[in-house]
């Protein structure tokens, strides 16, 4: 966000699930509680309820005001988590997206790629307790990584895979370089 501000680009930072009052309430339902709290379909419907609220209440109004929106996770995460991770049919998830959001999509999706074991180790080092997804087994996280990689390969115009196994500074440089190249702006750390 600092790099965008230094480049004179006004931006709104947000996250999913969450980002608006209703979506944050749904976030708590999704991330807290027992791992088996929701079946895959119920979980997906909750994610899309949160996403629709988020888009209507925050993302579209920000875009209408000429702001860039930087969102930590979006629709590709549902394809990866509930499709590749939970095994729901991808075409049904895509149909749900069209129903909830029409043709609304991100201009650029950066997929920070790290081996599953490394990602789980990093999550374990963060303060606070693990959420429902972080507690899932390594096999789930392997499917998740594979899903994100397949998403990036299927839509290389919109998606960029970034090696996130390096240190924070290296990853930041890679992100800024990719955003600069893809969106035609000069960003520096």
Mark where each language-model region is.
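ATP-dependent small-molecule kinase phosphotransfer cores
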Residues: 7-101, 174
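A generic structural signal for alpha->beta connector loops
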Residues: 8-10, 66, 106, 156-159
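NTP-dependent small-molecule kinase module
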Residues: 1-3, 117-189
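Hydrophobic/aromatic beta-strand patches that form the interior of the parallel beta-sheet core
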Residues: 14, 70, 108-110, 160-162
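Short aromatic/hydrophobic contact patches that present stacked aromatics
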Residues: 44-46, 111, 132, 161
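Short beta->alpha linker loops
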Residues: 17, 21, 50, 74, ...
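A glycine- and Lys/Arg-enriched "phosphate-lid" helix/loop adjacent to the NTP-binding pocket
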Residues: 78-146
């Amino acid at each position: 966000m600092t790099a965008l501000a230094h480049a004179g680009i006004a931006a709104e930072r947000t996250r999913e699930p969450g980002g608006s009052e209703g979506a944050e309430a749904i976030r708590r339902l999704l991330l807290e509680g027992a791992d088996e709290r929701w079946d895959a379909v119920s979980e997906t419907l909750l994610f899309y309820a949160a996403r629709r609220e988020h888009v209507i209440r925050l993302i579209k109004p920000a875009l209408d005001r000429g702001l860039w929106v930087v969102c930590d996770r979006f629709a590709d995460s549902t394809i990866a988590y509930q499709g590749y991770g939970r095994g729901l049919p991808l075409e049904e998830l895509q149909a749900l997206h069209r129903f909830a959001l029409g043709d609304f999509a991100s201009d650029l999706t950066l997929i920070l790629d790290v081996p599953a074991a490394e990602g789980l180790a990093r999550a374990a080092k963060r303060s606070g307790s693990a959420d429902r997804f972080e507690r899932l087994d390594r096999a789930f996280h392997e499917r998740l990584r594979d899903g994100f990689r397949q998403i990036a390969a299927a839509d290389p115009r919109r998606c960029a895979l970034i090696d996130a196994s390096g240190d924070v500074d290296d990853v930041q440089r890679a992100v800024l370089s990719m955003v600069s190249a893809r969106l035609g702006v000069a960003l520096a750390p």
